[in-house]
Structure formats: C-alpha cells, structure tokens
C-alpha cells in the first residue's frame, strides 16, 4: 500500500477503520466517517484482484448516506444481523467480517432497499461519481 494513500484512508477527517482483511492477493480496508449531515462509508482495496478488476494497483469506493436516511440504512443492515448492536459501526463491522462480502454487496443492499446514497470511486486511472438525493449535502460529505 502506498504510504500517501494509507494516510488518507486511515486518518482522513475522523475516519474510523471498521474492517481490514489481508490475503496474499488483496488488502481490503473499510472505514466510516460520521458527521452531523450523514455518513461516508469508504472501502479501499489494493492487490492483484484490484489490478485485475480496475487495471490499477489500488481503488477507493465511497458511499454517502445523509442523516435523514440513516434510520433506513440501519434498518436494512440490521435485518440479516439481528444479534448485532443496532449502531452503524457495529453493523458495518459485522457485515464486512465476512471475507466473502465486498463493497459492491453493500451498494446492492442499499439499491434493493431503495436507500438513497451517493457513490464516488477513484483510483490512479479514473474517477466515477453517482449522486442521488440532495446533491449539495452529498457533496459536502464528500469534501
């Protein structure tokens, strides 16, 4: 992992690392930034799988959910995890404790439950953005 990207991911504006998985082929790190306006879930990958999928050595995906949509997010995550404390950090930690769960699975869960979110992904070769809902508020959370 490049030192600059590690610093951004781990220490960026109150980001709490919830899960870190390392294998011989891939490192996955999931973090959460909580602000009064909403939350930002960040997933950084690095390794052979990332190189195969994105043609880049590392990739970062971010999902932003506004404060008004947090109850729906917690509800949809708590459904399959009834024994987990109903807080976002606990639910996300439990979700990503499963080595088979990828960041795209979280996005699929949000889409299926119709929980609005903004998405941003970036790496050394490209940036992708998808905004839904209050674009100004979503933009503020991404700053």
Where are these regions (language model features)?
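N-terminal low-complexity, Pro/Thr/Ser-rich intrinsically disordered segments
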Residues: 7-8
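Amphipathic, interaction-prone secondary-structure segments
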Residues: 11-40
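Intrinsically disordered, low-complexity coil segments
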Residues: 21-28, 61, 79-82
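Intrinsically disordered, low-complexity regulatory segments enriched in Ser/Thr/Pro
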Residues: 37-75
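Low-complexity intrinsically disordered segments
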Residues: 64-143
């Amino acid at each position: 992992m490049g030192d600059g990207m590690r610093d951004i991911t781990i220490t960026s504006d109150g980001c709490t690392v919830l899960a870190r998985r390392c294998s011989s082929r891939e490192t996955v790190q999931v973090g959460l930034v909580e602000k009064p306006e909403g939350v930002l879930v960040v997933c950084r990958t690095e390794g052979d799988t990332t190189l195969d999928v994105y043609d880049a050595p590392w990739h970062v995906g971010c999902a932003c959910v506004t404060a008004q949509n947090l109850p729906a997010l917690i509800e949809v995550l708590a459904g399959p995890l009834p024994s987990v404390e109903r807080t976002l950090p606990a639910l996300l930690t439990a979700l990503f404790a499963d080595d088979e769960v990828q960041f795209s699975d979280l996005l699929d869960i949000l889409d299926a439950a119709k929980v609005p979110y903004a998405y941003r992904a970036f790496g050394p070769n490209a940036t992708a953005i998808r905004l839904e809902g209050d674009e100004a508020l979503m933009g503020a959370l991404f700053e």
